[in-house]
Amino acid sequence: MPRYSITTFGCQMNVHDSERMHDVLRCAGYTEAGSADEADVLVLNTCSVREKAEQKLRSEVGRLARWKRERADRVLVVAGCVAQQEGERLLKQMRAIDVVVGPDNIPELPGLLGDLAIGGLPIARTVFDLDAPRFLVASPPSPSSSSSPRAAPTAFVTVMKGCDERCSFCIVPHTRGPERYRPSDEIVAEIAALVAAGTREVTLLGQTVNSYRDPLGALPRAPGASADDPDESEFAALLRRVAADVPGLARLRYTSPHPRHLTPSLVLAHAELPVLPRHVHMPVQSGSDRVLRRMIRRYTRAEYVARTRALVEAVPGLTLSTDIIVGFPGETEDDFAATLSLVREVGFKGLFGFKYSRRPHTPALKLPDDVPEGVKGERLARLFEESEALLAAHLSALVGTTQEVLVEGRDKERGHGGAGGALWSGRTGRHEIAHIDGAGELDLLGEVVEVSIARANKHSLQAELTEAARAAARPRQRGGLEPRPARRSLPVVAAEGG
């Protein structure tokens, strides 16, 4: 059996794409190698959002040249957004690459590898599936099979792909294409299958996930509402349908939304659906109206504040996190000060910060990149300092409280397990990471457990099971089934969304 290995760079969508590549390769008879050195086929699933993505790929391919030379039959595949962006140019520029495959062409990967194995030439396949969008689904273990691995507690489900927003800094519309939506019936069916296999939390994925529309018109609208009613949201209707049709689901998250589509009906869904956790990641990118206009974000600072405030008021205790770019062309010190003041005003409990980098095929490429790199770095450091202070105060305030944590797995590498041995780790409903001490002898995987917060770490919480949770927990069985991993490869660079 040919063996494969996948290395993933970039955003959560890329992680999900890699999981689907695992599925299509396994179904075609490939087996996963223990490491890249043992692989016959090595896939690099690339990200092009950040600066110098092509140079980073060239460096990685150069590093793998010896791996290729060791055996003539080894195959190097480049997938993801750099593959979509560069296409056949990659084959001409880097002769070590055998196959280039775009995100929409993942189902064709086994066939491309098969053609190559019988003497075919290196090939690039980067065609958007505009007429008949294909959405690869997860393949959970059968709930009826006692020998099947347990499903991971968390899973990702794609509801749409592509983006129509066309923010001036973003290459995603070029690498992922226009928005295409998946029928809600298919989405609900996939989530139901995951939950039946043991998954407790599902995250809905889309480049601008809350702009979702059912292509078959199967979701109900509010009485009297029209399709173009700005207060309505088919995405909110999708959330309601999942909540109603999959009652065993513990938590339903989504990423990445766009502030323009944070409608009153979506706010109301958050207020009324217990399955939606009290945390939303809502990218803002800048706190300056002048910069937001140059970014073509199509909202003002005041509109962002008003919409997120409505959400927080509707769901007491809800926390927000965000994405911010510093050093966008023309950003002044006053513009950056406006961003810092927005961070304080909204009170973000987490953020992903990035230095602006010029990307091909983006409108901002025409603007002078006039903020010096040193200034960008200094502003990013100040942004993180502000964010760290807000997070520290938030985590400290939780000490002594009781929280519900969805246990996602064992945390053996952190080295601060309690008396019960290895540590369990999970997230609260507000997305705080919690490490549970002194419960190594219990089987908590996939359970929503009540914990008492003992102390705050820099980016997480240290917790202990309450007496009631400990009494209700199952003892850990030696030799029991291990969960199937939720993520088989780790993203090495976070990418801004929304």
UniProtKB/Swiss-Prot annotation:
Its EC number is 2.8.4.3. Its cofactor is [4Fe-4S] cluster. GO terms for cellular component: cytosol. Signal peptide: none annotated. InterPro entries: Elp3/MiaA/NifB-like_rSAM, Methylthiotransferase, Methylthiotransferase_CS, Methylthiotransferase_N, Methylthiotransferase_N_sf, MiaB_methiolase, rSAM, rSAM_horseshoe. CDD domains: Radical_SAM (cd01335). The keyword tRNA processing applies. This is tRNA-2-methylthio-N(6)-dimethylallyladenosine synthase. The gene is miaB.
